[in-house]
Design a protein with these regions (language model features):
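Short helix-to-loop capping/linker segments positioned immediately adjacent to catalytic or ligand/cofactor-binding
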Residues: 18, 62-65, 97
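Short beta-strand edge/turn micro-motifs at domain boundaries
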Residues: 85, 105-133
Length: 134
């Protein structure tokens, strides 16, 4: 694959992460990580797919919450063979009684690796710097 094709494949994984997270497909989201991959959030850190899935389930909880979707922007990808360092920004938009609103925003820092022809997260750091005070 060319460098452009590799970068596009990485962007597809980033998009799939959001689709799976936004649709409560947590096991499928965790499957985008390597077997020893780490999901590092403001609410905790999970290493390995089982821990990643358990952490997202704990964070999301069981209480009803407004529907929200992630938007990822300003994606920068630095390829180095079968590894990549990625930086991007994200924002969530959610429903509220007053209409759509920004729920939270921040940045992702990713270490990705290509395994068996698939790009996967080895490490995803989420810096959440815009959010409701509640």
């Amino acid at each position: 694959m060319s460098e452009l094709e590799e970068k596009d494949a990485i962007r597809e994984v980033m998009a799939e992460y959001c689709f799976r997270l936004d649709n409560d497909r947590f096991a499928d989201m965790a499957a985008l990580f390597t077997a020893d991959g780490t999901w590092d959030t403001a609410f905790g850190k999970g290493t390995g797919r089982t821990e990643v899935e358990a952490l997202v389930r704990r964070i999301r909880g069981t209480a009803p919450r407004p529907r929200a979707i992630h938007h990822v922007t300003n994606i920068a990808i630095k390829l180095d063979g079968a590894t990549a360092k990625c930086f991007s920004n994200w924002v969530t938009v959610q429903n509220s009684e007053q209409g759509p609103k920004i729920g939270s925003a921040g940045s992702y820092t990713d270490d990705m690796v290509k395994q068996d022809g698939q790009w996967m997260f080895r490490y995803r750091k989420i810096d959440r710097f815009v959010h409701d005070k509640a």
